[in-house]
Regions:
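Active-site nucleotide/adenylate-binding loops and adjacent lid/helix of ATP-dependent enzymes
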Residues: 4-8, 32-36, 40, 44-138
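Short glycine-rich anion-binding loops that position phosphate/pyrophosphate groups of nucleotides
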Residues: 18-20, 95-96
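A short acidic, amphipathic alpha-helical/loop segment
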Residues: 25-31
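Phosphate/ribose-recognition catalytic cores of enzymes acting on nucleotide-derived substrates
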Residues: 194-196
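Redox-cofactor binding/interface segments in oxidoreductases and associated redox assembly factors
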Residues: 14-15
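Glycine-rich, highly charged phosphate/nucleotide-binding loops
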Residues: 1-9, 21-22
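Phosphate-binding site of ATP-dependent enzymes
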Residues: 103-189
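Aromatic/hydrophobic pocket-lining residues that form π-stacking "cages" and hydrophobic walls in ligand
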Residues: 28, 78, 186
Length: 197
């Protein structure tokens, strides 16, 4: 039933709710799965990718190259962070999209300023700190995998010098040649995260 009216079940559903996936949305997805509706990227896959740390943990258990990552909470022990992750470092909120909640910190002063700003705004949430992969600053690859097969690749590239390559932040997308490494990494990521697409 939708708004009290009986409706025919869809043949399939491809949830595209991203970081906005709420408990309510997940409950609907699980309900439809249990009714036999085919889900493209079902509830398990959504659980795997909605939380950036959880995704990182899944990928980190494999032989895939992943950046060193820490989960921290307020108050943050700066010395402990610096022992494990060198500057520059990337700081992220656990969920988010379009480059929001992602910051590059180049030194201890910037780190302390960002943490102070978080404290002043009562942002006492957990954050991820990652090593900066300097070769990828301002660009990243997006690999399209469908049912385990790599079918396309694009490079997102910042055009204004930002370290983030998000299209919504003014970046551009250009076709990118698939090689063996890209095919293997893309396919493995999709497999490990249980993604259909």
């Amino acid at each position: 039933r939708v708004d009290g009216v009986a409706r025919k079940l869809p043949d399939f559903v491809w949830p595209r709710t991203g970081s906005g996936t709420t408990y309510f949305i997940k409950a609907i997805i699980r309900h439809l799965e249990r009714l036999g509706v085919v889900m493209i990227n079902g509830s398990d896959a959504i659980d795997n990718v909605k939380d950036k740390l959880y995704s990182q943990q899944i990928l980190g258990q494999s032989s895939l190259p992943v950046p060193k990552t820490m989960l921290v909470k307020h108050p943050i022990n700066v010395s402990l962070v610096e022992k494990n992750v060198k500057y520059p470092m990337i700081i992220k909120t656990l969920s988010g999209s379009y480059g929001s909640g992602v910051f590059m910190v180049e030194d201890r002063k910037q780190f302390r300023q960002l943490m102070k700003m978080a404290e002043l705004s009562n942002a006492r949430y957990n954050i991820i700190i990652q090593e900066c992969v300097e070769d990828s600053l301002g660009r990243d690859l997006r690999v399209l995998v469908v049912n385990g097969k790599v079918v396309g690749c694009m490079m997102r590239q910042s055009i204004d010098g930002d370290f983030r390559a998000n299209i919504t932040r003014g970046g551009e997308a250009i076709p990118y040649q698939i090689d063996e490494d890209i095919e293997w990494i893309g396919g493995e990521c999709a497999r490990l995260l249980d993604l259909d697409i």
